[in-house]
């Protein structure tokens, strides 16, 4: 009897320790390193895609990558879902932070920028990031 209780307690400890190792993902979402991911085969501009992701789950956003391994995981998911090789990720307005300077070393004082914002998409055929108008349409991957 004592041995049964000891073994049962041991199994309970193992179960509880393993249950916290993966994210609690919704049905249809895939888990990696404590986060949940889902590719959506819907064409949206960047802002609409980000808004859609925030509505899926608390803490949801367009995917962000913290490592090449995470990017590889997401690309495999995307290839199973998309007809196209590009998808939005959560990086945007990267050019607004640049310190522009003229080639003659003069500071930029006069500005006539178009109101175009640039957002970043992931090209899964070569695992590279590219920027394009945030108004363009692309598939996307959400993460929470």
Swiss-Prot record:
Calcium is required for ligand binding. This is Snaclec coagulation factor IX/factor X-binding protein subunit B1. Residues 32-143 form the C-type lectin domain. It is found in: Secreted. InterPro entries: C-type_lectin-like (IPR001304), C-type_lectin-like/link_sf (IPR016186), C-type_lectin/snaclec_domain (IPR050111), C-type_lectin_CS (IPR018378), CTDL_fold (IPR016187). Heterodimer of subunits A and B1; disulfide-linked. It comes from Trimeresurus stejnegeri. The keyword Calcium applies. Disulfide bonds join 25-36, 53-142, 119-134. It comes from the Eukaryota. The keyword Disulfide bond applies. It holds the Pfam family Lectin_C. Residues 1-23 form the signal peptide. Anticoagulant protein which binds to the gamma-carboxyglutamic acid-domain regions of factors IX (F9) and factor X (F10) in the presence of calcium with a 1 to 1 stoichiometry. Expressed by the venom gland. Keywords: Blood coagulation cascade inhibiting toxin, Calcium, Disulfide bond, Hemostasis impairing toxin, Metal-binding, Secreted, Signal, Toxin. One of its GO terms (molecular function) is metal ion binding. Belongs to the snaclec family. GO terms for cellular component: extracellular region.
């Amino acid at each position: 009897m004592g041995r049964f209780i000891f073994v049962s307690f041991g199994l309970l400890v193992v179960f509880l320790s393993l249950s916290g190792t993966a994210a609690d993902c919704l049905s249809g979402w895939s888990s990696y390193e404590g986060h949940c991911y889902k590719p959506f085969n819907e064409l949206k501009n960047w802002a609409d895609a980000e808004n859609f992701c925030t509505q899926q789950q608390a803490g949801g956003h367009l995917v962000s990558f913290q490592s090449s391994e995470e990017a590889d995981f997401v690309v495999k998911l995307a290839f199973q879902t998309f007809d196209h090789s590009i998808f939005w990720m959560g990086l945007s307005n990267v050019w607004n932070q640049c310190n522009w300077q003229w080639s003659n070393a003069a500071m930029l004082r006069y500005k006539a920028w178009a109101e175009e914002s640039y957002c970043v998409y992931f090209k899964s055929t070569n695992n590279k990031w590219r920027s394009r108008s945030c108004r363009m349409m692309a598939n996307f991957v959400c993460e929470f």
